[in-house]
From Swiss-Prot:
Record InterPro entries: ADH-like_C (IPR013149), ADH-like_N (IPR013154), ADH_Zn_CS (IPR002328), GroES-like_sf (IPR011032), L-Threonine_3-DHase (IPR004627), NAD(P)-bd_dom_sf (IPR036291), PKS_ER (IPR020843), Zn_alcohol_dh (IPR050129)
Subcellular location(s) per record: Cytoplasm
Chain positions recorded as NAD(+) binding sites: 179, 199, 204, 266-268, 290-291
Protein name: L-threonine 3-dehydrogenase
Family stated for the protein in its record: Belongs to the zinc-containing alcohol dehydrogenase family.
Record field: catalytic activity: L-threonine + NAD(+) = (2S)-2-amino-3-oxobutanoate + NADH + H(+)
Record GO biological process: L-threonine catabolic process to glycine
Assembly and oligomerization: Homotetramer.
Gene transcribed to yield this protein: tdh
Length: 345
């Protein structure tokens, strides 16, 4: 195996990514080197491409980016015991310290010292990625490489949707991007009574319909209160899944929640936007922030959903070779795509 590999690198502090030859990551005693077969583009990667304010403050240059992937093990460290070369795997993209109170209590997703693959350390937009053995997730034979490559965002959806009991509940999802749609699908399969998803992007609304969401609302044209009445809702929503990061959508969600409603918030909103906290207080709402996946309970649950028949394939709207990565990022930046999966083989 060559000691150099092809990778997408944030090589300059400006808009874009560049394909370069970089060293293959070194494998420590507790590490696993994975030959990447499929990579998916995340919204985080788009922020890095755009070199926005968050990226400028967060991403060291140069950096191999990317964190949504699947592949097979190419090499294992001397102390690795659970995996073998050739095994099909994906990986948890949050590297935790294992030493803080939350880690030692089994709450690794709450680690204060989390490092992100492709953000704080070299990522998976390369022919190889190296992660700790503890972050490796084996992929069952009945799950394809491309579905495994989107397990990271699917895990965000599963973690968000399953934050609260859904059986018999009316659920509002704001934001019909891929994670929002997957969250709505999880809610539907988990026994929710009514599942409503809102957005203002026609392409995303059509994608939600294609994947079988029953109540798809164009918030730029339809009044959510009228939709609720039309589908037989006499009270507000019991559970809200905020996936949009859009202040108007979040405010509308708060307005439409039932007293005692519960909201899981994954969408990253602009800093400093206003909400009416009196409504939160007097409605006695429960707000919960979500970041990433529970380690590793969420992974078990998402694998079970897929093996149980949840078809995520239609959420992948673009399948391209890695050399066409610019086309993939153009599709993502346009807002007129679902997931974009890139093939390294």
């Amino acid at each position: 195996m060559s000691n150099m590999m092809k990778a997408l690198v944030k090589a300059k502090p400006e808009v874009g990514l560049w394909m370069e030859n970089v060293p293959v990551p070194e494998v420590g005693p507790n590490d696993v080197l994975i030959r990447v077969k499929k990579s998916a583009i995340c919204g985080t990667d788009v922020h890095i491409w755009n070199w926005d304010q968050w990226a400028q403050k967060t991403i060291p240059v140069p950096m191999v980016v990317g964190h949504e992937f699947s592949g097979e093990i190419a090499e294992i460290g001397s102390a690795v015991t659970r995996y073998h070369v050739g095994e099909r795997v994906s990986g948890e993209g949050h590297i935790v310290c294992g030493k803080c109170r939350n880690c030692r209590a089994g709450r690794g997703h709450l680690c204060r010292n989390t490092l992100g693959v492709g953000v704080n350390r070299p990522g998976s937009f390369g022919e190889f990625v190296c992660i700790p053995e503890s972050n490796v997730v084996p992929i069952p034979d009945d799950i394809s490489d491309e579905i495994a490559a989107i397990f990271d965002p699917f895990g965000n959806a599963v973690h968000t949707a399953l934050s609260f009991d859904l059986v018999g509940e009316d659920v509002l999802v704001t934001g019909a991007g891929p994670i929002g749609i997957m969250g709505a699908l999880v809610a539907k399969r988990s026994g929710a009574r009514k599942v409503v998803i809102t957005d203002i992007n026609p392409h995303r609304l059509e994608l939600a319909r294609k994947l079988g969401i029953d109540h798809v609302v164009d918030a730029s044209k339809e009044n959510l209160a009228d939709v609720m009445k039309a589908i037989g809702m006499t009270e507000g929503f019991d559970v809200g899944l905020e996936m949009s990061g859009a202040a108007p959508a979040f405010r509308d969600m708060i307005d439409k929640m039932n007293n005692g409603g519960k909201i899981a918030i994954l969408g990253i909103a602009p800093a400093g936007f206003e909400i009416d906290w009196n409504k939160v207080i007097f409605k006695m709402l429960n707000l919960k922030g979500i970041y990433g996946r529970e380690m590793f309970e969420t992974w078990y649950k998402m694998i079970a959903f897929v093996q149980g028949g949840l078809d995520l394939a239609p959420i992948i709207t673009h399948r391209i070779g890695i050399d066409d990565f610019r086309d993939g990022f153009e599709a993502m930046r346009s807002g007129n795509s679902g997931k974009v999966v890139m093939d390294w083989m």
